[in-house]
Amino acid sequence: MALKQFNPTSPGRRQLVLVDKSELHKGRPEKSLVEGLTKSGGRGGNGRISVRFRGGGAKRLYRVIDFKRRKFDVPATVERLEYDPNRSAFIALVKYEDGELAYILAPQRLKVGDQVIAAEKADVKPGNAMPLRGMPIGTIIHNVELKPLKGGQIARSAGTYAQLVGRDAGYAQIRLNSGELRMVQDGCMATVGAVSNPDHMNESLGKAGRSRHKGRRPHVRGVAMNPIDHPHGGGEGRTSGGRHPVTPWGKPTKGRKTRKNKATDKFIIRSRHARKAR
């Protein structure tokens, strides 16, 4: 889908660039696949802010997406493509031959009327899902499971994809967008193709109000705060902060590695930081 630009009838429209959604469904979502969604306002279970600069925004309904794709050998037809306010990718409503409806992540080049299927071995065409052991090497994939039966976790946002680059001893090797090369069990499911809406990254909201509609509040810089609020705060007039960039809690930011999961380090063949170190 193309990008839409607007005549500069106001400052907010001058900068506005949106994805053209004219081909998407214009009605309500499928009622049987929708749940209520309570806003958190960036607060955790104890009521304290755990993520700053969140709150407000338009009311949403949660669309229940099938990330597992374990309904094997039953063809499904794409009924329509839809916008989903809870993610950057578009979603597709599919109807299985037995009458069941489901939402799946829409890959690029998937159209209304196309047939998709999940199987142990299926055609390599966008929207078809199968275990990694059944795919040809070099296939572009998305919605990849990290553990069998857990549901897809890798490459789910707009325009993302991974590539199957090898198989060995019960594991598949996949290359991620970040440059990371990692192993997952070859029984994990993945869907063929790249995720829809690749132009999402080129959108420009044009004005602060559109950010507020999405539930994002103003992001205040540390150097604009008082010393009590941030290590970069205070000073007479405008300052540069006077130290290496840190978080509000004093931990180094901008480039500091934060990964702490030694149990799964063995599955990472090449770190996403490897090419930067050269």
Curated annotation (Swiss-Prot):
According to the UniProt record, where is the region Disordered?
222-264
Q: Which GO terms describe its biological process?
A: cytoplasmic translation
Q: Which UniProt keywords apply?
A: Ribonucleoprotein, Ribosomal protein, RNA-binding, rRNA-binding
Return the GO cellular component terms, semicolon-separated: large ribosomal subunit
Matching entries from InterPro entries are given as: NA-bd_OB-fold, Rib_uL2_dom2, Ribosomal_uL2, Ribosomal_uL2_bac/org-type, Ribosomal_uL2_C, Ribosomal_uL2_CS, Ribosomal_uL2_dom3, Ribosomal_uL2_RNA-bd_dom
Q: Which GO terms describe its molecular function?
A: rRNA binding; structural constituent of ribosome; transferase activity
Family label: Belongs to the universal ribosomal protein uL2 family.
Query: Per its database record, what is this protein's job?
Result: One of the primary rRNA binding proteins. Required for association of the 30S and 50S subunits to form the 70S ribosome, for tRNA binding and peptide bond formation. It has been suggested to have peptidyltransferase activity; this is somewhat controversial. Makes several contacts with the 16S rRNA in the 70S ribosome.
Fetch the PANTHER family from UniProt. Answer: LARGE RIBOSOMAL SUBUNIT PROTEIN UL2M, RIBOSOMAL PROTEIN L2
Do you know which NCBIfam families this protein is assigned to? rplB_bact (TIGR01171)
Q: How does the record describe its quaternary structure?
A: Part of the 50S ribosomal subunit. Forms a bridge to the 30S subunit in the 70S ribosome.
- The name on file for this protein is Large ribosomal subunit protein uL2
Q: Which gene encodes it?
A: rplB
